[in-house]
Amino acid sequence: MRTPEEQIRYAASITPSPRQLAWQQLEFYAFTHFGMNTFTNREWGDGTEDPALFNPDALDADQWVAAVKSAGMKALILTCKHHDGFCLWPSAYTEHSVKNSPWKNGQGDVVREVSDACRRGGIKFGVYLSPWDRHDARYGQGKPYDDYFVSQLTELATNYGDIFCVWFDGACGEGKNGKKQIYDWERYYAVLRKLQPNAVLNVCGPDVRWCGNEAGHCRKAEWSVVPAELRDAERTASKSQQADDGEFSRKIDSQDEDIGSREVIRNARELVWYPSEVDTSIRTGWFYHPEEDTDVRTADELLDIYLDAVGANASLLLNIPPDTHGRIAAPDCASLTELGTKIQQIFASNVTEKAAITADSAIAQHPITQAVDGMANTYWQAAYGQESDTITLKFPKPQKVSCVVLGEHLPTGQRIESGEIWADGSKVSEFTVVGHKRICRFAPVEVLTLTIKITASRTEPTLRLLAVYQ
């Protein structure tokens, strides 16, 4: 058993894999729930749907990508197969797919069109493949179904270029035979590690965890270093993509928000890097429903979610469901475009370089100037033995500021536990963990001296990013 001091140093030594680090840098990306449910006006299909129902008359994947990019998103994940088992690509392993639909006379491939559009648009492409299949008779029979599922994973992982993410839902209901399948997760992971080694495996995967709700909220202190047991994703199967029953959409409260504090990790034998993804939808449902056209989240609502997630060491996965024509609906596009504008406005005026910056301590190789040089691989580190520090920015004349953005150097671990921001002797903001990014917004103030106090850290704090905005 480690001593408390040894345990904290152990926690500070846990670092992300290259694939996790690349994923974290995306920050904000899209989910597109599209498939048979779009045409039946349901959220969950039962697998008995006729492929003839799938017939978008104006599918435009480039329009999807343009809508995604208008909000500043950098990737898109497509629901290639939802629980109903209908496949958006002409899989060789089932007849329940687009090849038996009237769309493009059975010659179409939604996965191909979307993956190609993502590459044309300069964003990354990912896939969602539900392991629960309410159509296929092999579901619930063990290895025969696993063979089928792995065959489909292999098709997606080999025929559509690089995939940045494979998103696994934890839903596990009954199949046609009334049985549930025991998923062979380790086999699925092994196939994907071989075929797409750079892809993160999310939610029911070992790389990225679910935040615990689909309301768009994350914890006050969202640690990426957590006990290894969380990788089991036990809550996902019972809570992921459920009906909005109040429990599903509530904000996380103090009783279950602590998953990485000193107290929680004190006796953990193994700690892992398992960062958080916040997933939510621009609409009430995950699939498109025409009656929800008047209930699209506003840009202001989406901005609050963005700042609460991306600004608190999580990434944001925002669902935007295409309609029955195969296009992103006009109300959704309008909210996304306005959201992108609002995000740009917040970060339009970086005034950091106007200030002279100092830190109470630093090691020689990593001075405080490396936190503000705009380089991804340089960083400030406090002197050895320091578990708190103060950074001071002095402006030559009063400067209006309203936002400070901080980011740790994750290849050396997540360390900062808490801090404060002071403007000319008055505290204007407090923060908990920093991790990849902490966005601190406060009422605009005019300031000569801005002070950032790191009040607690697991060993010496680091910052690769420090930016002050007007």
Protein language model features and the residues they cover:
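Mature catalytic domains of secreted/periplasmic carbohydrate-active enzymes
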Residues: 1-387, 393, 405-407, 414, ...
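Long, charged, low-complexity intrinsically disordered regions
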Residues: 427-428, 470
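Exposed beta-strand and adjacent loop surfaces of beta-rich binding modules
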Residues: 401, 416-418, 449
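Extended extracellular/luminal ectodomain segments enriched in beta-structured repeat modules
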Residues: 388, 396-403, 447
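Short, surface-exposed acidic/glycine-rich loop or hinge patches that mediate macromolecular interfaces
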Residues: 398-400, 411, 457
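Extracellular beta-strand ligand-recognition surfaces/modules
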Residues: 447-453
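Edge beta-strands of jelly-roll/beta-sandwich modules across compartments, strongly enriched
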Residues: 458-470
